[in-house]
Amino acid sequence: TIGDADVYTSLGPIGVLGQSLYDPGPLRTRIQSELTDGMLDEIAAQYARGRRLLIQTVDIETQIPYIWDVTQIAAKTGQKRQQIITDLLLASAAIPGLFPPVRVRVQRPDGIADELHVDGGLSAQIFFAPPGLDLAKFEIEYFGRPREQNLYLLRNGKLAGEDEAVQLNTLALTNRAISTLIKSQSRQNMDQIRSSLAEQGTQVYTAAIPDNFSSKPESMFDTAYMRELYRTGY
């Protein structure tokens, strides 16, 4: 099981004045060790079957969200695919302040540019497809007929508010405000997806951490907490 030491190292006081509080170097090493040619070939094979593995990030400089097709990258970018996907995975986990932004090289109409990308949660906690996408029309075009549509939304967090005493200091109040914002954004994202797809006959199922799950992590990647959470979900 992955713990804190497998994901980051603390930068100590110097991190306050730098890009982030933590260095995700261990996570980069772990991702690169897992993204073997064999795994990338398996991901690429799913692209040929019409399946998509999507990752969302945000360009922190332009404030524009990007959705990356990892399956296509695995299938069509040759020797650079491991590096590109590693960077995108790190960027998708780069919570500003905690982890540094990741520099991603992209092809623009006016040439190649380096962009700074961070966690896509800044734009949306959950995403599915561009607004207004007509799924039935899409399926008729690619499969010859509309099919039964089921969408499963999984949220690694609680959706309901939690009654909790908050210490009256800047850090505690800021953390509480961010937690409240994330929950509100998650509910709005899920409601928006559900309402937009209901008109097309799509059945939407949702799952989140139960309200009665009372355990609290001692750190960002508390192994004992993650095991208990897994048992609850399983």
Stretches with model-predicted labels:
Residues 1-234:
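Patatin-like phospholipase
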